[in-house]
Each structure stands twice: as structure tokens, then as C-alpha cells.
């Protein structure tokens, strides 16, 4: 009895295991008739469903068992036939606005596509998984993709768990939850891998965020799919303004209508033989959607686009929003153009618009555009300096640079260059490209390794001061961990310019990379343990110490130094400490702890007077982004500006972007007012210059004058007009993505931000009025456009969101040194500027019928003067008192 019972238990266990492991099966000789619909809608995430644009395809779908593997019962070949096709709008439009009204499926799809879509196809179904799809290879790609979408609705399994599987949208991690007669299939879309390629901006602050979800709910009856409902959403938004977002919603529904008598299965040993017997034109075409290239009928070519936008790209139009908008249109056209087309436009462009065209061609970042611009520019000639520098800056701001771009600059640097300034810019910009490629994980590419070796060895390979500075600035852009020892070495240099560049470069590194040895070097510089340093060098060293996780003793020694420094540096360091406390910078808790010691914190130390200052504040705070600024100004003891440093930062998505840094440095000007230089600065050559860092890219510094004779000649010929530091068009945000949907349709998303910018600065001296004035002027216009489209070769629908603005920011410092203490007034003004948001939606048929809707909202943001410390306000009243 016991052996028999044991045998029964074993048989029961085997049967149960077999049942759990079995997949869904269709019966022979039966036809399963379903209704099917797939719908795609596009809108803003906050838009009402009635405001969607898109289309719906509905049909009947008949499925029957064509063949079953005699050895593996769960391997089945299904024949699927689509019929009674209808195409209609997914939005709720009036009859007047419904472009699908009165149109038949044949008039929309075309006779060839309709016949191909209604042609039966085969699906190899094993354990509920689609292993292959068979169709005629000559069928249009759009038709095959729609068939893949229908087949994807059959994907299922009868036990819970996670696995990687492929359907129309790609190979993804899928989670199944099985409960009696219901199967819930959740696809983790962030894991999906497909044949589609795209690119995005490297900076999270300027980048795009996405949210996506996909779920299919399958209801079973007697082991057969009774219904399957799929919902898939993709939302893309601009990090700096999440309201500017687009959404695509895809729905699929498969519902069993009836089960009727159908054809019997075909006999055969293997799949290949059966498929050939059914239709010798059938080939395995894969499950994942294939790429399609919809043809744009009536779209303008590059020359036509250029003629339409060139008037908005003239220099006098760059401060208007039309300039970056036209720039984005031109970049879009350039990316579809050949090298010869691009060269033709370059060669037939006016001199005034050519610099802007160079910006656009370089920003296109295609092999054709790069090859065309390199052939057009002649770096051996000095007279092309403006165009050459615009090309180099556009490379530095490239959103997704390639190895070929870096290799091209390396070859330019090794060739004949007619201008010293261009030679410097080439090397400096190579550093910026190096960093961006390393951030993409491409640090081991051959060109990257060559440039890395060049930059690391560069400072020690030359005795020319300008070349050493060039390599140090390139390292400041590259931010290589291997560059820290090189920068630490030059930070202690006897040449002030080397020290300043090296120290400000170290400040850009992650504090975790600043080693104890580097900190010791910075402390030696600040406290002058080995030699005397210039004030601006010591101040820069103090900034790095305070921002690099300082120790208790480091902070204490900084505080104890106040009172033993040159007069204006005492005031600068005091302002710096107070700014750390007021703005709650990372070191503020440690500073508070040190200040509990009365030796470090007392009235004598904290009552130092002077005009130097350090101040941080908020420019803007929104739910999406926080924008801060800081202004540091250091004067010599005689009242002449030594260093002015303005920084603007943007923070979003836990990432920081150094949006702007403008530094004006001056030295050796005491002789103009018969004043005595500070300690360590007695032998400095007269010099004034300006350096800019824009969107994390250090640009080549600009010299106002160098040497006493140059100073005097410029003073007598000075017009008072500011000197341009950087001017041009920048592709700030650049995101391109193709989203394969489970329905077999493909959504394309493009987000781009164009910025026209003009940064200039100047210094004015009046010996008669004993007054100096420095100015930094920032003017620009910003346009951001994001669109999501589903474009087949028979219908297209899309939604576009955007916003634009024009702004001016001026920073002016006025110093009156007719008496001591001298009067200093700092002004940071933002003018009133317009702000516009737009939303447009569109549906279009090949016949030319189109529905479009556009809405916009305008507002004016009032201008303001950014608040600085109260001491500055009091000083400004005195400076401008006579005028009041």
C-alpha cells in the first residue's frame, strides 16, 4: 500500500509542476476573434484628456493555431490577421477641426499599406512569449511595426516573477503578478534596450528629466486571453522649469468577441518548414520595432531655411528672442544637411551674419557639419580670428562632443596657426572637451589619452609665460584628478598669474579630491610660510581652504590672521567669514565653533574697516532651480581695484552648474595716483584684464592693457566703450530621443535651448576726478523648445512647449579715491524683462489636411537692483550724493 501511495504522490507532484510551468495554449481548429485598438495621445502632463492630439487605429484581429510543436506542446505558431481597419482622431475635436472626419482607412493609409496591414502574419508563441514574428520583408516598416504591436499584446506568463524579455518596445525587465484569472505585466521602461540612439546634455541642471510607466492587465478565461489592456506613458520635462513638459500616452486594447470554427493546424516537424509551406515570402523580421524615416514633403532645404532666418541672426538682433529661436531652427536644418550644402551656405553668407552661422554649424555636431567648418576655416591666417574663436567656443559648449571633434582640435593645435590668441584658445577648449568626454565614460579613447598627456606635461614643457598660463587654463577646464599635483605645484609659483590660475582651478574640483598635501600647500600660500605672495593669490587660497572641508585648526588660523594682514585684505577676509555665516555655506558650523574662542572672535578682530567685500545672495528661487550669486572685491591699500570676481550658480536635481564667472584683475596702478604698493607687489608690471568662465567652460582671458606704456596710450585713446569678452549663440540644452512604444509606434522627443549672449567689460580711470569705474555687462536672450511627436508615413501628431525671455544684468563698481578711506559703490542691476510661455499642438495627414492650435502666456518681470550689504548701500549714497 505504501509504495502505491508514494507513486501517486510523485505523479501528483509532477502533474502540478507541469501545470504551473505550462503556458497558454490555443485549440486546434478554432478561430479566436478579437477587437483591437491602439491609441496614441500627446499633450502636456497637466493637460486635460480632451486636449490630446493623436490618433486611434481600431480593427478586428483573428488568431488561429497554425502549427504546434509535437515535442513541445507550448511552442505554437499562430496566424494573425488584421481586418476592418479604421483610423480616427484621439482628441475631442469639433467636426470642423477633425481632419479624420469623412476619411477612409484607405485614403489615410494608402492602398499599398492597407493591403499589407491586412495581410496575415505569423507569431511563434512559446510559453506565452513571442519568440519570433514572420512577415513579408517587402512590407513597409510602419506596417510591420503595427503588427509587432498587436503581437506584443500576447506576451504573458502564468506564474509571478521577474525576467528580461523583448517585445515591440525593446528588451526590458518585466515583472509579472498572477492572481487567479488575472495577469499584470509591469514593464520597467528605464531598463529597455532598443536599436534607437539619441543624445542628451551632460549637465543635469540644463538637462531633461523623464518619467515613464507601462502596465498590461490581462484577463484569462479557460486559459485563453479574454482581454488585455495596456497603458504606457512617457513624460519629459526641462529640469530648470518642469512646467515645460510633454507627455505621450499610448493605449492598447485586445478583447475577445467570439470563438468560432477555424482552419486546422498544419503538420510539420519544425517552424522553418511550416512557415515556408504557409508562405514562401515570409521571413523572420524580429519582435522589436525597426527604424523608420518619414519623408518630409515640402520641407525647406538648408539654403531656404538660411534665407528665412538670416535677418534675425544679424549682430543688432542678437539681444532679441528671435535670434536664438532662429538659431535652433537653423541647427535643426543643418543636422539633416550634407557637407556640400553646408559649405555652399558658408561661402555665400554676409560678413556680419557669418559669425552666427559658424556658431550654428559647429553646434549641429554632425560629421558633415564638423567636416564642412574645418574645411571652411583657415587657421593659418590671422585675419580669420573672430570666426576661428567662435568655432572654438562653440566646440567648448558642445552638448555631446565626439572623439572626432577633439581629434580635430588636436590636429589644429599641431598645425600652423596664424594667431597666438587662437593657439591659446584651441588648447584651452581641448581641456573642456576632455572633461565632457570623460564625464560620458569615454576617458580611454585614443584622442582623449593623447590630449590628457599633452595637457599634463604642458606647463613644464615651456618657458613662455603665456604658454604656461594656456596649459594651466586647459587643466582648469579638464578637471583631471591627475592634474591636481600639477596645479598644486604651480599654486606655489613665484609668478602671480600662475598661482591665481592654479588655485582657482583647484577650487573647481570636488572637495573630496583635495588631499592633505594640497591643503598644506594652500595654507603655506595664505600664511606666507615660505615666501611673500600677492594679495589676490592669498585671497584665492583662503577661498579654496574654506570650501574644501577645512579642519578646526585651519579655520582658526584663518580667523587669527585677521588683523595681521594688509589693510584691505583684513576687511576682505572679515567679509568672507561673515558671508560664510550669513549664507550658511558648508563650513559655517565649524566657523561658529571656532568663534566660541574669544581669542579668535573679539571686537578688535571683527571691527576692521575697509572697502573690500565678499557677499553672496539669491538671484532666483523656484521649485525647479535655485540661482545664487556672489561678489568678491579686493582693493589695494591705495584704493585701486586689485580683483573683482562675480559668480552665478544654478542648482537643480542635486547638481550644480557654474553658469558664469567674470573676473577683472588689475595690478601696478599705484603709480597713477602716486600711492605706495602693498607688500609683495612693489615690482608688479601695470596690467588689467578680464577672464570669463561660462557654463563650466573657462574661456581665453582678455587683456585691457599690459605695461606702463600700453596703459598710458590706452588711457589717452580710451573711448570708454566696454571690451567684448564673449559674444555668440550657444546650444545650452540638446536632447534627442526616440521612444519605441509597445504599440509599434515610435515617439520622437527633442528638447533644445538656444542662448544668445554678449558679455563685455571695461575699466575707466579719471585722474582729474580721481575716480575709477569697472563694469561687467551681460546681455542675452533665451529660448527653450521641447516637442514630442509621433510621425508615421500616413499621419503625424505632436505637441510643443516652450518659453523665451530677454534679460540684461549689469555689475558696476565705482571707486572715488580722492580721500581716505576711499568710497566704493557696487551696483548689480537686472532690467525689466519679458517672459513668454507657449504650447502648440498639431495633427497632420499626408493629403495636407492639418489641425493646429497654439496658446501663449506673456508676462513682464520687473527689474530690480540686487541687494548687497548695508555698508555698500551707505557708501553708494555718498558716492552719488551730489547727483541727488
UniProtKB/Swiss-Prot annotation:
Provide the species name. Danio rerio (Zebrafish)
Q: Which SUPFAM superfamilies match?
A: Lipovitellin-phosvitin complex, beta-sheet shell regions, Lipovitellin-phosvitin complex, superhelical domain
User: Which PROSITE patterns does the record match to this protein?
Assistant: VITELLOGENIN
Q: What does this protein do?
A: Catalyzes the transport of triglyceride between phospholipid surfaces. Catalyzes the transport of cholesteryl ester, and phospholipid between phospholipid surfaces. Required for the assembly and secretion of plasma lipoproteins that contain apolipoprotein B. Required for yolk lipid utilization and absorption of dietary lipids in larvae.
Checking InterPro entries in the record gives: Lipid_transp_b-sht_shell, Lipovitellin_superhlx_dom, MTP_lip-bd, MTTP, Vitellinogen_b-sht_N, Vitellogenin_N
Protein name per its UniProtKB record = Microsomal triglyceride transfer protein large subunit
So which residues are the signal peptide here?
1-21
**How is the activity of this chain controlled?**
Inhibited by naringenin.
Q: Chief localization class?
A: endoplasmic reticulum
Lineage runs:
Eukaryota, Metazoa, Chordata, Craniata, Vertebrata
On subunit structure and binding partners, the annotation says: Heterodimer; heterodimerizes with the protein disulfide isomerase.
Keywords of the record, alphabetical order, are:
Disulfide bond, Endoplasmic reticulum, Glycoprotein, Golgi apparatus, Lipid transport, Lipid-binding, Signal, Transport
Keyword Lipid biosynthesis belongs to the record: no
Amino acid at each position: 500500500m505504501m509504495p502505491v501511495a508514494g507513486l501517486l504522490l510523485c505523479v501528483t507532484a509532477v502533474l502540478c509542476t507541469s501545470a504551473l510551468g505550462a503556458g497558454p495554449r490555443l485549440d486546434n481548429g478554432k478561430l479566436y476573434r478579437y477587437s483591437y485598438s491602439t491609441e496614441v495621445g500627446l499633450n502636456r502632463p497637466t493637460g486635460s484628456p480632451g486636449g490630446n492630439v493623436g490618433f486611434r487605429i481600431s480593427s478586428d484581429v483573428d488568431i488561429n493555431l497554425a502549427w504546434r510543436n509535437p515535442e513541445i506542446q507550448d511552442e505554437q505558431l499562430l496566424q494573425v490577421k488584421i481586418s476592418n481597419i479604421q483610423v480616427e482622431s484621439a482628441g475631442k475635436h469639433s467636426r470642423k477641426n477633425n481632419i479624420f472626419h469623412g476619411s477612409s482607412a484607405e485614403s489615410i493609409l494608402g492602398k499599398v499599406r492597407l493591403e499589407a496591414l491586412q495581410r496575415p502574419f505569423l507569431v511563434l508563441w512559446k510559453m506565452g512569449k513571442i519568440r519570433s514574428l514572420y512577415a513579408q520583408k517587402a512590407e513597409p516598416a510602419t506596417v510591420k511595426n503595427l503588427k509587432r504591436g498587436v503581437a506584443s499584446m500576447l506576451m504573458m506568463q502564468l506564474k509571478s516573477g521577474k525576467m528580461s524579455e523583448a517585445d515591440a518596445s525593446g528588451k526590458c525587465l518585466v515583472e509579472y503578478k498572477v492572481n487567479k484569472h488575472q495577469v499584470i505585466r509591469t514593464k520597467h521602461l528605464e531598463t529597455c534596450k532598443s536599436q534607437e540612439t539619441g543624445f542628451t546634455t551632460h549637465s543635469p541642471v540644463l538637462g531633461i528629466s523623464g518619467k515613464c510607466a507601462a502596465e498590461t492587465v490581462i484577463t484569462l478565461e479557460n486559459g485563453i486571453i479574454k482581454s488585455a489592456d495596456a497603458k504606457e506613458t512617457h513624460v519629459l520635462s526641462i529640469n530648470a522649469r518642469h512646467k515645460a513638459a510633454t507627455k505621450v500616452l499610448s493605449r492598447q486594447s485586445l478583447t475577445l468577441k467570439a470563438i468560432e470554427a477555424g482552419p486546422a493546424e498544419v503538420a510539420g516537424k519544425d517552424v522553418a518548414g511550416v512557415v515556408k509551406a504557409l508562405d514562401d515570402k515570409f521571413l523572420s523580421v524580429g519582435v522589436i520595432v525597426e527604424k523608420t524615416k518619414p519623408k518630409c514633403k515640402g520641407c525647406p532645404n538648408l539654403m531656404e531655411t538660411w534665407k528665412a532666418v538670416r535677418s534675425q541672426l544679424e549682430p543688432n538682433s542678437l539681444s532679441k528672442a528671435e535670434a536664438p529661436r532662429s538659431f535652433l531652427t537653423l541647427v535643426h536644418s543643418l543636422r539633416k544637411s550634407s557637407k556640400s550644402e553646408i559649405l555652399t551656405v558658408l561661402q555665400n553668407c554676409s560678413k556680419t551674419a557669418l559669425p552666427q552661422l559658424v556658431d550654428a554649424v559647429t553646434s549641429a555636431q554632425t560629421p558633415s557639419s564638423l567636416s564642412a567648418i574645418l574645411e571652411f576655416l583657415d587657421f593659418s591666417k590671422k585675419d580669420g580670428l573672430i570666426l576661428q574663436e567662435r568655432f572654438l567656443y562653440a566646440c567648448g559648449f558642445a552638448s555631446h562632443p565626439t572623439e572626432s571633434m577633439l581629434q580635430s582640435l588636436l590636429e589644429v593645435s599641431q598645425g600652423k596657426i596664424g594667431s597666438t590668441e587662437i593657439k591659446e584658445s584651441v588648447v584651452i577648449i581641448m581641456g573642456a572637451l576632455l572633461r565632457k568626454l570623460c564625464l560620458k565614460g569615454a576617458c580611454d579613447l585614443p584622442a582623449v589619452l593623447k590630449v590628457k598627456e599633452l595637457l599634463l606635461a604642458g606647463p613644464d614643457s615651456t618657458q613662455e609665460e603665456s604658454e604656461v598660463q594656456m596649459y594651466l587654463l586647459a587643466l582648469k577646464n579638464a578637471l583631471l584628478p591627475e592634474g591636481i599635483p600639477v596645479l598644486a605645484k604651480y599654486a606655489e609659483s613665484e609668478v602671480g598669474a600662475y598661482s591665481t590660475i592654479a588655485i582657482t582651478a583647484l577650487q573647481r574640483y570636488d572637495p573630496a579630491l583635495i588631499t592633505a598635501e594640497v591643503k598644506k600647500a594652500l595654507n603655506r600660500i595664505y600664511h606666507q610660510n615660505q615666501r611673500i605672495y600677492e594679495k589676490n593669490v592669498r585671497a584665492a587660497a583662503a577661498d579654496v581652504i574654506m570650501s574644501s572641508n577645512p579642519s578646526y585648526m585651519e579655520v582658526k588660523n584663518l580667523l587669527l590672521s585677521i588683523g595681521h594682514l594688509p589693510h584691505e585684505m583684513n576687511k576682505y577676509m572679515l567679509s568672507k567669514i561673515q558671508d560664510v555665516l550669513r549664507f550658511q555655506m558648508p563650513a559655517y558650523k565649524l566657523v561658529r565653533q571656532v568663534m566660541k574662542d574669544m581669542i579668535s572672535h573679539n571686537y578688535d578682530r571683527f571691527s576692521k574697516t575697509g572697502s573690500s567685500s565678499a557677499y553672496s545672495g539669491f538671484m532666483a528661487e523656484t521649485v525647479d532651480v535655485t540661482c545664487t550669486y556672489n561678489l568678491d572685491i579686493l582693493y589695494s591699500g591705495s584704493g585701486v581695484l586689485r580683483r573683482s570676481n562675480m559668480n552665478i550658480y544654478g542648482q537643480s536635481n542635486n547638481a550644480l552648474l557654474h553658469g558664469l564667472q567674470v573676473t577683472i584683475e588689475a595690478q601696478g596702478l599705484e603709480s597713477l595716483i602716486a600711492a605706495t604698493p602693498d607688500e609683495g607687489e612693489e615690482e608688479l608690471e601695470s596690467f588689467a584684464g578680464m577672464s570669463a568662465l561660462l557654463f563650466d567652460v573657462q574661456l581665453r582671458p582678455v587683456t585691457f592693457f599690459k605695461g606702463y606704456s600700453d596703459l598710458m596710450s590706452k588711457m589717452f585713446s580710451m573711448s570708454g566703450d566696454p571690451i567684448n569678452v564673449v559674444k555668440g549663440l550657444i546650444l545650452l540644452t540638446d536632447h534627442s530621443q526616440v521612444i519605441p512604444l509597445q504599440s509599434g509606434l515610435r515617439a520622437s522627443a527633442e528638447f533644445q535651448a538656444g542662448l544668445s549672449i554678449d558679455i563685455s567689460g571695461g575699466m575707466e580711470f579719471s585722474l582729474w576726478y580721481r575716480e575709477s569705474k569697472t563694469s561687467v555687462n551681460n546681455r542675452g536672450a533665451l529660448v527653450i523648445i521641447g516637442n514630442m511627436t509621433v510621425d508615421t508615413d500616413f499621419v503625424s501628431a505632436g505637441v510643443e512647449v516652450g518659453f523665451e525671455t530677454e534679460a540684461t544684468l549689469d555689475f558696476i563698481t565705482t571707486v572715488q579715491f580722492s580721500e581716505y578711506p576711499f568710497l566704493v559703490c557696487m551696483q548689480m542691476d537686472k532690467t525689466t524683462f519679458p517672459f513668454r510661455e507657449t504650447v502648440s499642438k498639431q495633427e497632420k495627414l499626408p493629403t495636407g489636411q492639418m489641425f493646429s492650435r497654439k496658446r501663449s502666456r506673456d508676462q513682464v518681470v520687473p527689474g530690480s537692483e540686487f541687494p548687497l550689504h548695508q555698508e555698500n548701500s551707505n557708501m553708494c549714497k555718498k558716492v552719488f550724493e551730489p547727483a541727488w
